[in-house]
């Protein structure tokens, strides 16, 4: 009989223990919005009634705007992308990343920045796309990942310009879901929430659909928490909320993280 080349028995046991521990980690689903990024210094449309540094949202963030003036749209998103290099993850982002030591943390974000990833979070679903990615204007399913981080043959720098194309010669556009467009990641987000053992809502009042419907997908026995400095953000959800933290994200999320560790035994 030939001796197997697999793991020795003690190693197999340790491997199975690790797999079992990983499988049993409670699933924490975080629904994050603009408020958590605002605390890092990023501008949001809500800061000034639909304006961003003087740009009207309807003139730069719709398919109609792209058709009418693509250069203006690219100028706007190039500026937003550049701002990412001026900010850092805050205490809320870091607290969520630290929870991965003890929990299966899955983030569903409405934000197009990369602050969750830069803080160390490894499972992030971007409902509305990502500023550092581009795609062909004719195909929402084709994404040139990270091309704006390192440059590439069609895009020599961090900005997109008219004439920057994919390998078929099709113009590139920001990989961002504009107002009026479908949300391709919605099904994945819904499946993520359905597996939650606890849900945290932070930096968003969850008033805009389709994202607003995600809370209703969480199993009824699953506790839902919210962190938001605006007490009215809980309106419409108070009967569903286990706890509400009327605090900025950078204060409330670390407090919630400590509480959830105690509650779920980690």
List each model region and its residues.
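Conserved catalytic core of sirtuin-type NAD+-dependent deacylases
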Residues: 2-266
């Amino acid at each position: 009989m030939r001796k197997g080349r697999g793991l020795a028995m003690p190693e197999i046991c340790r491997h199975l223990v690790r797999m079992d521990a990983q499988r049993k980690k409670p699933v924490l689903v975080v629904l994050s919005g603009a408020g958590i990024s605002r605390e890092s210094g990023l501008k949001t449309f809500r800061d000034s009634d639909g304006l961003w540094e003087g740009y009207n949202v309807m003139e730069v963030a719709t398919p109609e705007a792209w058709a009418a003036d693509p250069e203006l749209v690219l100028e706007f998103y190039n500026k937003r992308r550049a701002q990412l290099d001026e900010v850092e993850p805050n205490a809320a982002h870091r607290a969520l990343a630290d929870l991965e030591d003890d929990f299966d943390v899955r983030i569903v974000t409405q934000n197009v920045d990369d602050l969750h990833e830069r803080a160390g979070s490894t499972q992030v679903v971007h409902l509305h796309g990502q500023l550092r990615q581009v795609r062909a204007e004719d195909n929402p399913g084709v994404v040139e990942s990270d091309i704006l981080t390192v440059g590439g043959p069609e895009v020599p720098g961090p900005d997109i310009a008219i004439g920057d194309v994919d390998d078929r010669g099709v113009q590139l556009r920001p990989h961002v879901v504009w107002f009026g467009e479908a949300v391709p990641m919605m099904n994945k987000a819904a499946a993520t929430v359905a597996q939650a053992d606890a849900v945290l809502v932070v930096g968003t009042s969850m008033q805009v659909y389709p994202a607003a419907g995600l809370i209703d997908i969480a199993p009824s026995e699953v506790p839902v928490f919210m962190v938001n400095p605006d007490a009215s953000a809980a309106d419409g959800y108070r009967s569903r909320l286990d706890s509400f933290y009327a605090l900025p994200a950078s204060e409330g999320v670390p407090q919630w993280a400590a509480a959830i560790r105690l509650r779920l035994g980690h």
